[in-house]
């Protein structure tokens, strides 16, 4: 197997830059810089030389096979974070036989291949690297720490027990089986189905935390939607004008709201129009507003809600509070009056939705659990009917087991890896 190397830290000027090596020649590659090797897991300062020239002073760390991130013999070189120092060491490594620059995500791929991580942990690491908010970080850390693997292993153990009991009735069909195993199998399946359904519900919330919530600002033309968006975003994200119908397309602004990733949507004003371009913008506004997690209905002077019927958590807000007396929740994007109260109301509603978040954070997790549920429900129905053909119920349990195994990458893993590792840098 090749020994791979890459810059593991971000490019650019910094205090420290970290180079990572993994593979059978990792130690020899470090020694090629004319340094004595430190003990494993002991950092040591060494002067790196190449062709008689000092390249840099660096901290060297070695990791033994089976006790590193990748599971292979590995090394880290902590350099001064100058582009020139990093470039000189990378150039030297490229001249060594048996070494090559790592592909994107290849260190993590080797950790997966060597059993250091399961597929769900790899996804958790990808989410951790992409996390923007505290809620995303906490959720990604739960997945990266192995929460999905541990839970799946418990489910798998119970399912294997149920399958083994059912297989026994097939293997000894011509003999007297001393105990009727059907009640125990039914009980195991009922508990598993209940657990998985609860996790499916929680996964929908977890997906929203991972991807971010969408909040649409809707209302009549010139109600102040774009001004409100700018006030919430604390920057000029949308063009504002006294001319009604200025906003034609949906404007998106990503922000951190109370530790949650939120995308605010400024939409076209809702009204009857003969302008085909404006009509298209209104259609898009209604489509995005319906799909949003929450809507802010910004009222104009008429005080009428337009376009859609508000749902339970939606906020109805009186706009342009600086120009007239208002009741209830009201805001002024120009003066900032009421903005903090609106932000707090949004936070309360969105945080309440995260209370039921589970550990399963991706659509593929939810779909795999739903496949397992369907297969187990099919087996359970047959058991309730007396199992005239137990081999059919046993096949359902095998399908359920395969669905659970796909959660952690025991099966069907190759098709997913390209998509997952496409978001990794070469040093990860």
UniProtKB/Swiss-Prot annotation:
- The protein's required cofactors: K(+)
Subcellular location, record wording: Cytoplasm
Instruction: Say yes or no: keyword Zinc present.
Output: no
Amino acids binding Mg(2+): 226, 247
Quick one: which residues bind K(+)?
222, 241, 243, 246
- Where along the chain is GTP bound? 222-227, 241-247, 266-269
Give residues annotated as binding (6S)-5-formyl-5,6,7,8-tetrahydrofolate.
20, 76, 116, 428
As to how many cofactors bind and how, the note says: Binds 1 potassium ion per subunit.
Q: Tell me which domain of life the UniProt entry assigns to the organism this sequence originates from.
A: Bacteria
Annotated TrmE-type G domain ranges read 212-351
Q: What is its main location?
A: cytoplasm
InterPro entries per the UniProt record, alphabetical = G_TrmE, GTP-bd, GTP-bd_TrmE_N, GTPase_MnmE, MnmE_dom2, MnmE_helical, P-loop_NTPase, Small_GTP-bd
Give the CC-aspect GO terms.
cytoplasm
The Swiss-Prot or TrEMBL record annotates one GO molecular function as: GTP binding
Q: Which PROSITE patterns has this protein been placed in?
A: G_TRME
Enzyme Commission identifier(s): 3.6.-.-
Biological process terms in GO annotation: tRNA methylation; tRNA wobble uridine modification
Oligomeric state and interaction partners are given as: Homodimer. Heterotetramer of two MnmE and two MnmG subunits.
Give the function comment from the record: Exhibits a very high intrinsic GTPase hydrolysis rate. Involved in the addition of a carboxymethylaminomethyl (cmnm) group at the wobble position (U34) of certain tRNAs, forming tRNA-cmnm(5)s(2)U34.
Fetch the NCBIfam families from UniProt: PRK05291.1-3 (NF003661), small_GTP (TIGR00231)
In the record, the note on similarity to other proteins reads: Belongs to the TRAFAC class TrmE-Era-EngA-EngB-Septin-like GTPase superfamily. TrmE GTPase family.
UniProt protein name: tRNA modification GTPase MnmE
Q: Which organism is it from?
A: Cereibacter sphaeroides (strain ATCC 17025 / ATH 2.4.3)
């Amino acid at each position: 197997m090749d020994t791979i190397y890459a810059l593991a830290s971000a490019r650019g000027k910094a205090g420290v830059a970290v180079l990572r090596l993994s593979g059978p020649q990792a130690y020899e590659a470090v020694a090629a810089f004319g340094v004595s090797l430190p003990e494993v897991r002991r950092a040591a300062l060494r002067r790196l030389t190449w062709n008689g020239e000092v390249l840099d002073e660096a901290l060297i760390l070695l990791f033994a096979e089976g006790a590193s991130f990748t599971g292979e013999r590995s090394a880290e070189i902590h350099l001064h974070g100058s582009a020139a120092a990093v470039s000189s060491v990378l150039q030297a490594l490229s001249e060594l036989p048996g070494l090559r620059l790592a592909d994107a995500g290849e260190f993590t791929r080797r950790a997966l291949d060597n059993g250091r991580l399961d597929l769900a942990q790899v996804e958790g690491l990808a989410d951790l690297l992409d996390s923007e908010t505290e809620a995303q970080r906490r959720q990604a850390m739960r997945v990266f720490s192995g929460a999905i693997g541990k839970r799946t292993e418990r489910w798998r153990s119970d399912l294997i027990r149920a399958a083994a009991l059912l297989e026994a009735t097939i293997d000894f069909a011509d003999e007297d089986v001393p105990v009727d195993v059907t009640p125990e199998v039914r009980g195991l399946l009922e508990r598993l189905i209940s657990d998985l359904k609860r996790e499916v519900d929680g996964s929908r919330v977890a997906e929203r935390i991972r991807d971010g919530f969408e909040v649409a600002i809707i209302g009549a033309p010139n109600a102040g939607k774009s001004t409100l968006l700018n006030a919430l975003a604390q920057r000029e994200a949308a063009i504002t004008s006294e001319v009604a119908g200025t906003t034609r397309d949906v404007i998106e602004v990503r922000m951190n709201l109370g530790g949650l990733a939120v995308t605010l949507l400024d939409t076209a004003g809702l009204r009857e129009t003969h302008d085909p371009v404006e009509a298209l913008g209104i259609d898009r506004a209604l489509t995005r507003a319906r799909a949003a997690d929450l809507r802010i209905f910004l009222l104009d002077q008429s005080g009428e809600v337009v376009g859609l019927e508000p749902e339970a958590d939606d906020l109805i807000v009186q706009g342009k509070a600086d120009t007239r007396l208002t009741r209830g929740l009201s805001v002024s994007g120009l003066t900032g009056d009421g903005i903090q109260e609106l932000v707090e109301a949004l936070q309360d509603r969105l945080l309440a939705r995260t209370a039921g978040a589970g550990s399963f954070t991706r659509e593929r997790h939810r779909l795999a659990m739903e496949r397992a549920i369907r297969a187990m429900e099919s087996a359970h129905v047959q058991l309730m009917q007396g199992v005239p053909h137990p081999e059919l119920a046993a096949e359902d349990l095998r399908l359920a087991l395969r669905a659970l195994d796909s959660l952690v990458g025991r099966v069907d893993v190759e098709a997913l890896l390209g998509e997952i590792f496409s978001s990794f840098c070469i040093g990860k």
